[in-house]
From Swiss-Prot:
Pfam families, sorted: Pyrophosphatase
Name of the protein: Inorganic pyrophosphatase
Compartments where found: Cytoplasm
GO CC, alphabetical: cytoplasm
Record note on modification: The N-terminus is blocked.
């Protein structure tokens, strides 16, 4: 058990919906800033934003106080990823590693592009379908260097340490051996998932090859350094909310009562979710280039 819990506000699949995180004392925290990057030696925390097979594009709201999880919005409409044949929604549990930040002011030497201004993304490949807002502990196995509309957008490949097969996975080659086709599907998914929305295919550094565990950890630790500069005001976040309750060296630290006041001002939890539009289930067929 991680000791963290989540609390929903308003109804899922609405513009007002939020998922706030709490610590073991039941106090509200930021999943971006207050959950430690490391859970143990070489074990990272992961904030689950999108459960496997689902379509609603949920993400940590980097500009909102306490950074709750909310559904992404484009042109006033809630975003859902398309089902690009043969896939259904996201093909892994998708989320982020806390206390990391891909700095948009830093030009990555591997990709030649600046960061995407978000925590680093994680694709968790275990057998369990996780819950939105769940905090899990993961082993990092490798990383993919995606370039999304000119921005560096690293994709970490990891597995839940609680997975029954976790002991068999220690590096990216284990994924190739034990889950044949999964990494190829991952590249294909990321390359084409925006095409149904009229966007071009995404590009990749390293000819779309996955780098190994050690390379991945180096990248994650560099994004942790960028995060620390952000939260200690050594870097201008330009609109990012760095409000936190635990980072003692941060000028943005607040007390638990101030955090509670943020949540108390929002709509209460809702018993039922709104209906997902039926066209979200549509299957798109697109010729691979």
């Amino acid at each position: 058990m991680s000791g963290f819990s989540s609390e929903e506000r308003a109804a899922p699949f609405t513009l007002e919906y939020r998922v706030f995180l709490k610590n073991e004392k039941g106090q509200y925290i930021s999943p971006f800033h207050d959950i430690p990057i490391y859970a143990d030696k070489e074990v990272f925390h992961m904030v689950v934003e999108v459960p496997r097979w689902s379509n609603a594009k949920m993400e940590i709201a980097t500009k909102d106080p306490l950074n709750p999880i909310k559904q992404d919005v484009k042109k006033g409409k809630l975003r859902y990823v398309a089902n690009l044949f043969p896939y259904k929604g996201y093909i892994w549990n998708y989320g982020a590693i806390p206390q990391t930040w891909e700095d948009p002011g830093h030009n990555d030497k591997h990709t030649g592009c600046c960061g995407d201004n978000d925590p680093i993304d994680v694709c968790e490949i275990g057998s369990k379908v996780c819950a939105r807002g769940e905090i899990i502990r993961v082993k990092v196995l490798g990383i993919l260097a995606m370039i999304d509309e000119g921005e560096t957008d690293w994709k970490v490949i990891a597995i839940n340490v609680e997975d029954p097969d976790a002991a068999n996975y220690n590096d990216i080659n284990d994924v190739k051996r034990l889950k044949p086709g999964y990494l190829e599907a991952t590249v294909d998914w990321f390359r084409r998932y925006k095409v149904p929305d009229g966007k071009p295919e995404n590009e990749f550094a390293f000819n779309a090859e996955f780098k190994d565990k050690n390379f991945a950890i180096d990248i994650i630790e560099s994004t942790h350094d960028y995060w620390r500069a952000l939260v200690t005001k050594k870097t201008d976040g330009k609109g990012i909310s760095c409000m936190n309750t635990t980072v003692s060296e941060s000028p943005f630290q607040c007390d638990p009562d101030a955090a509670k006041a943020i949540v108390d001002a929002l709509p209460p939890p809702c018993e039922s979710a709104c209906t997902i539009p039926t066209d979200v289930d549509k299957w798109f067929h697109h010729q691979k280039n």
